[in-house]
């Protein structure tokens, strides 16, 4: 009877430890996702995102991007 109680206690201990570890891993994954989330700034539906092919004479790149005349794709424009 004592051996069965010890085995049940160990099994319960392992389940609690595993649940705690899974919860901790989930919190870490959420934190990393928030830290490394890259959101494309796109206010208009018709604007072109980063690295999209564009026409320099009719620049439809999203805010913060500019159509490059030489490469003809939307590049980041800090100014």
UniProtKB/Swiss-Prot annotation:
InterPro entries hit by this protein: Huwentoxin-1 (IPR011696)
Family: Belongs to the neurotoxin 10 (Hwtx-1) family. 34 (Jztx-26) subfamily.
UniProt name for this protein: U16-theraphotoxin-Cg1a
Cell compartment(s), UniProt: Secreted
Known tissue expression: Expressed by the venom gland.
The protein's role, per its UniProt record: Probable ion channel inhibitor.
Disulfide partners: 47-62, 54-67, 61-74
Pfam families, per the entry: Toxin_12
TM ranges: none
Prosegment location in residue numbers: 20-44
MF annotations from Gene Ontology: ion channel inhibitor activity; toxin activity
Comment text on domains: The presence of a 'disulfide through disulfide knot' structurally defines this protein as a knottin.
Keywords recorded for this protein, A-Z: Disulfide bond, Ion channel impairing toxin, Knottin, Secreted, Signal, Toxin
Signal peptide: 1-19
Taxonomic superkingdom: Eukaryota
Recorded GO CC terms: extracellular region
UniProt KW tRNA processing keyword: no
